[in-house]
Amino acid sequence: MFKKVLVANRGEIACRVIRACKELGIQTVAIYNEIESTARHVKMADEAYMIGVNPLDTYLNAERIVDLALEVGAEAIHPGYGFLAENEHFARLCEEKGITFIGPHWKVIELMGDKARSKEVMKRAGVPTVPGSDGILKDVEEAKRIAKEIGYPVLLKASAGGGGRGIRICRNEEELVRNYENAYNEAVKAFGRGDLLLEKYIENPKHIEFQVLGDKYGNVIHLGERDCSIQRRNQKLVEIAPSLLLTPEQREYYGSLVVKAAKEIGYYSAGTMEFIADEKGNLYFIEMNTRIQVEHPVTEMITGVDIVKWQIRIAAGERLRYSQEDIRFNGYSIECRINAEDPKKGFAPSIGTIERYYVPGGFGIRVEHASSKGYEITPYYDSLIAKLIVWAPLWEVAVDRMRSALETYEISGVKTTIPLLINIMKDKDFRDGKFTTRYLEEHPHVFDYAEHRDKEDFVAFISAVIASYHGL
């Protein structure tokens, strides 16, 4: 096992990795910049080093991070998610410098990061894929020809995409021609190249993903699926495990396919295969994420498997201690992302200082966060404040527990997604499992909530009115 690990990330995921390392008896090294010198992950780590002043490139400075690991005697680097987590050049640099990258081999990251190549690999492994182009589109004329063959609507998306960028839905040829150039330009701006794919667009889809875990000796298991259909701007907001869509037979069938595919590409570490699902539960491969997912806790809650610890164990050369038969799915887990955003203003970021912060607790409730009173929400990073996770033996109980926990969670100073999430938990369609990736568009009433006023603010307001009235 490693003696020291450098965590090349920030926020809640850095705290999560540091906690896992501590439980394994591993010393931890945090990195930070000038504006995050008092951040929670910095305080939690055994050692912490400021490696930059500019908050925009601190966690993207691959060479400086690897050099620091060598300087302080860290044998491995955990990249978390985002930043350099799926950067094959960073993983390769670690290998070249003799540092263990806690994740899959850089060649696999490179392969699965290319949507066109990854789709070809999945096809060969027998995993269903969405009908569409076999590779990168040559031009808009080829896109028009394929769209005519498979029928509208179709989806244009960037081959190197992620985070919902470079994606366009086209319902006819006119929209396809117009969106082709827009998608191309967006892809160039976001990913450095404009390679586009075209696929059949599945109406009323669900977003289903399978968690896999493999070691360096060819052993691979799956930990079931998650439903991540409730999204804003193609980014996840609520995640559920297991899904309400798949039957046990479908779970076993698709689980065996993802395990087979992972073995064929030589995958080790934690990974997630993402699918789009139609109303009958047919799954079609979209992409593979070669890192820990934001939503991994819901899978941990229903399986009892600590995914982050196993990432570290596998990187250190340990064999998996589980067979597929050992994995049992117990109850239901829901995760809500608490973001510093204003849902009523198109989820615009809410910048400011957290003035009041109270976290819920109790049986079946888990909070992953790096926030506290006085925590500064800046424009430099993702708006995630915390992840609220609940578990219960029954779906209805899990939903009620999440609603209650959300109502108990107190954050002031910035707008958050909490009021919206409370309304989602109360919504009959959500409770009945009748939701797709279009849920928020089709349920505008969940945005209808009163702005919360803190008791202290209200008392101060009344006091000011009284003082003004009496001329005080």
UniProtKB/Swiss-Prot annotation:
Kindly identify the residues recorded as the active site.
Answer: R291
Xref: Pfam families: Biotin_carb_C, Biotin_carb_N, CPSase_L_D2
List, alphabetically, the InterPro entries matched: ACC_Biotin_Carboxylase, Acetyl_CoA_COase_biotin_COase, ATP-grasp, BC-like_N, Biotin_carboxylation_dom, Biotin_COase_C, CbamoylP_synth_lsu-like_ATP-bd, PreATP-grasp_dom_sf
Record domain ATP-grasp: where: 119-316
**Catalyzes what?**
hydrogencarbonate + 2-oxoglutarate + ATP = (S)-oxalosuccinate + ADP + phosphate + H(+)
Q: Where does ATP bind?
A: K115, E199
Outline the extent of the Biotin carboxylation domain.
1-445
The coiled-coil segments of this chain are none
Q: Does the keyword RNA-binding apply?
A: no
Co-factor(s): Mg(2+); Mn(2+); Co(2+)
Q: Name the Enzyme Commission number(s) assigned to this protein.
A: 6.4.1.7
Q: Which SUPFAM superfamilies match?
A: Glutathione synthetase ATP-binding domain-like, PreATP-grasp domain, Rudiment single hybrid motif
Q: How does it assemble?
A: Heterohexadecamer of 8 large subunits and 8 small subunits.
What's the protein here called?
A: 2-oxoglutarate carboxylase small subunit
What species is given as this protein's source? Hydrogenobacter thermophilus (strain DSM 6534 / IAM 12695 / TK-6)
